[in-house]
Amino acid sequence: FSIQMDRFSFSETRYLNRMIDYEYFKDYKSRVQMLFVQENNPLSVYKNLENNGYLSITDEHSFTYTIIVSDFSGNERIVRIPIEGETYASIKPKDIKTTPYFVDADEATAFEEKGIDVYIPSNALYEDTYLNIKFVGDSIHFHEDNTPIHKNITIGFDVEKYSPEDRKKLYIARLYGYYKNPSYVSTYKKGARFTTKTRTFGIYTLVEDTIAPEIKALNFSNEKWISNNTTLRLKIEDKGSGIKNYHATVNGKYILTEYNYKKGTLTHSFEDGVVTETENKLQVIVTDNVGNSTTFESTFFRKN
């Protein structure tokens, strides 16, 4: 068969998970392309398919498997792999670890235990799968993240045991890395039920955040002249649920600020022309994803 990567539909993008060895990609951060077409892979890039690329090898045959790769400029590389058929006394079948949490890929499936529930719509997984799931306290250890998910899966938490005030500061997080640090995931709150939608397996849990964001001036100080500055720069940070929004004004007028997510900085350019007074009162309000808020105020002077 052949693969022609000139173009493919945006709606097909997620199916690229079936074109590569996804488990290898997640474990080693390197993409290995499959030279056969797995089930539930409707990508339109495949041409001249014969037996979906699968080979029938017997002990009576030897042949050469040829791979030809070319780029858009016509450069070409050829790899030839000799294959010799060989008879084995027995072939050990692949071990399939069974669990109580079986998902038929063609059917919607739901699990619920200890106040946590999971809904998996039909065709969310690419193939029938036994999931490894553990419900521990306010956490769900939800399979392994080297298994791809095609459609959003919903995870729900019953938070009835928490007071309405405590619920305001709770959010759903995914734990990541060696130290299992919490990372905020979009949390939908309705009464005593919190839900999130995800296309990544992993550990999900409830986390409390009562600490407000931090704001610090970077290139100016309170009640100082900054006539030579071309910008106002501030550092904003939230170590809990993460920053949801920010708002900055000078003398009560809204000013445009650019947020650099990687550096955690807010920058306003004086070229915008909003700051026209000599004495200026800056106010910056930063709010995190559970409503904790910090207000930063400073006065600066500037010749115009």
Regions found by a protein language model. Name each.
Residues 113, 123-127, 135, 163-167, ...:
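Short proline/glycine-enriched turn/loop motifs at strand-loop junctions of beta-rich domains
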Residues 101, 109, 210-214:
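Proline-centered linker/hinge motifs at extracellular inter-domain junctions
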Residues 146-204, 245-247, 253-256:
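Proteolytic-maturation and junctional protease-sensitive modules
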Residues 153, 168, 201-215, 279-287:
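Extended Gly/Ser/Thr-rich low-complexity repeat segments
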Residues 207-241:
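N-terminal non-catalytic regions of secreted/periplasmic and cell-surface proteins
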Residues 90-95, 103-104, 127-171, 222-228:
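Proteolytic processing hotspots in large secreted/extracellular or virion-associated proteins
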Residues 121, 156-160, 231-239:
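Short edge beta-strand/loop segments characteristic of extracellular beta-sandwich folds
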Residues 1-88, 191-196, 237-304:
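Long, low-complexity serine/threonine/glycine- and acidic-rich segments characteristic of extracellular
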